Amino acid sequence: MGELAPITKIIPVLVVTAFMVIGMMLHQTARQKQILGVLWLQAMRRLITHLQRHRGLSAGVLGGEQALEENLSEVRKQVFKDIDAINGVGEWMNQHADWLSIVEHWTRLIGSMHRLSVSDAIHQHTLLIKNVLALVDEIAVEHHLHDVPGGSQWRDLLTLAEYVGQMRALGTAIATVANHQDEIAVNKTREDLQELSQEILTSLDSPNYRAGIDGDNLQRILDFLSYVDAQLLKDAPGVEASGFYAEATKTLDQLFKRFDQQLSQVHQRLAH
């Protein structure tokens, strides 16, 4: 019995050590899963950016602004590269039904673009982006990113960016269609622009949105709304399609820059 005493003392220590090791391994596995989620979000952000650009350029080209055709072709190629990059992050996405549906929707959209009206093209792009944003939310939940401090403020930036992205497409359409004297289309699109402008202002009144946006971006958005009001909502549009598209893109690029900063901070917290 005396020989067993040292062993019986060691066993509890070994058990505790084993549990500690298992706990550390589980924690590390969970952390790796969160980091993988961040990588997917970063890739999805690039896809959203290019889908939004494609929507705006399509609105111009289908409305008759052929000067935007070359840019549209380049952005289209970039979307396909984004899809390949997302597929390369991991197997989870390759087998995800919603992701496969998004890719299929994009392929159908490209194949039918030449037959779509401006409004239908904008609608299809917006529906596609809405589905990508829903998948972004699922990625965040599935990979427990909301458990990370500051791990959800970036999401409101995507919502704001999509509002601005829709305004870019509608504004480009107005500036293009106006050149062809389609007053009915211009008036309808103006109403849509006014609704989006109000959506943005309402969102900016929310403390959650204010927490994630910096002062420079807040002012930039407000300035952009004033620009839209002055150039597109007063009498005849006072800006060309390419000029409006470029101005809206500046606002969007800064919002996405802020998004990248916030997601980078999440990644840094997980990596240390």
Protein language model features and the residues they cover:
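Hydrophobic alpha-helical segments
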Residues: G2-H272
